[in-house]
Regions:
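Protein kinase subdomain VIII
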Residues: 1-14
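N-terminal beta-hairpin/loop module of FHA
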Residues: 160-200
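Cys/His-rich microdomains that often coordinate metals
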Residues: 138-145, 157-160
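Terminal C-lobe "cap" of eukaryotic-type protein kinase domains
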Residues: 98-131
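Conserved C-lobe activation region of Hanks-type protein kinase-like domains
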Residues: 16-22, 27-96
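Short cysteine-rich clusters marking metal-coordination/redox-active sites
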Residues: 133-137, 148-154
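Conserved small/polar residues in nucleotide/adenosyl-binding loops
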Residues: 236-243
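Forkhead-associated
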Residues: 207-235
Length: 247
């Protein structure tokens, strides 16, 4: 029952798309944080009976990081990985899990509004695109809600790079970062096909640019208000809107 939605555990409902979305959230949480989202100090019983299982996973589940209820927090020395990993992820990742395991979504009146697959796709696509390399050589996350971040490996403070924002997607503008169709085409959610790359100037490495590797023309709006199209010289051009970088 550890992977079942509370209403399935209680026998109130058979599995369907809504209950499957709860199970998906459990699996994703365990992949990232190496522990079950409902197992904290509250569930550390000498003998986990069937009655207690129905309570912890069915009638009265409590997310270990519930911002409104700390009754089931992870235990130091027991849930070590979870305690270490949770604060390392950007706020938008943590908030999505908080929503997925909120009381209302688990057992309240909002069980039909669980986090859908498309939202998870957007969250993890953005997480990938906000991953950059620290000077220590390790990869780390950039939190778009923070002006500065710390490397999750060495702890060094990292100044937030410019961030590209298109629709619900964000991407750190660091040399070598790929831009995908979901970044450069407003009607696309394709997060696999690379359409461009962030590059730095040969003469001034601190000056960044976007290289168009697609078959479309990117239209840039210049500081004076005029526009200019940029097309890869080796490709035929179509037309596509150009996303705008933000600081």
């Amino acid at each position: 029952c550890r992977y079942m939605a509370p209403e399935v555990v209680m026998g109130q409902k058979r599995p369907d798309s809504h209950t499957d979305r709860f199970s998906l959230a459990v699996v994703l949480y365990m992949l990232l944080f190496l522990n079950h989202p409902l197992e904290g100090k509250r569930t550390m019983c000498p003998c986990l009976t069937e009655e207690l299982e129905r309570k912890f996973y069915g009638s009265d589940p409590v997310f270990v990081w519930d911002p409104a209820n700390d009754a089931n927090r992870p235990v130091r020395g027991v849930h070590t990985n979870e305690i270490k990993l949770w604060p390392l992820y950007p706020a938008f990742v943590r908030k999505t899990f908080e929503k997925a395991f909120s009381h209302e979504v688990m057992v309240g009146n909002d069980t039909t509004h669980r986090v859908i697959e498309k939202v998870w796709q957007e969250v993890f696509t953005t997480l990938r695109d906000l991953t950059i390399k620290c000077s220590c050589g390790s990869e780390t996350f950039i939190d778009p809600s923070q002006q500065s971040c710390r490397c999750i490996n060495c702890g060094k403070s990292i100044e937030r790079p410019p961030i590209l924002k298109v629709k619900k997607y964000h991407a750190a503008l660091a040399p070598g970062k790929k831009l995908y169709a979901c970044h450069v085409q407003y009607d696309s959610d394709d997060f696999k096909e690379a359409k461009g790359e962030v590059i730095s100037s040969r003469n001034n490495p601190s000056l960044l640019g976007l290289r168009n590797d697609s078959n479309n023309t990117w239209e840039a709006i210049l500081p004076n208000g005029s526009s200019k199209g940029y097309t890869h010289p080796d490709r035929k051009s179509g037309s596509a809107g150009m996303p705008r970088p933000i600081s």
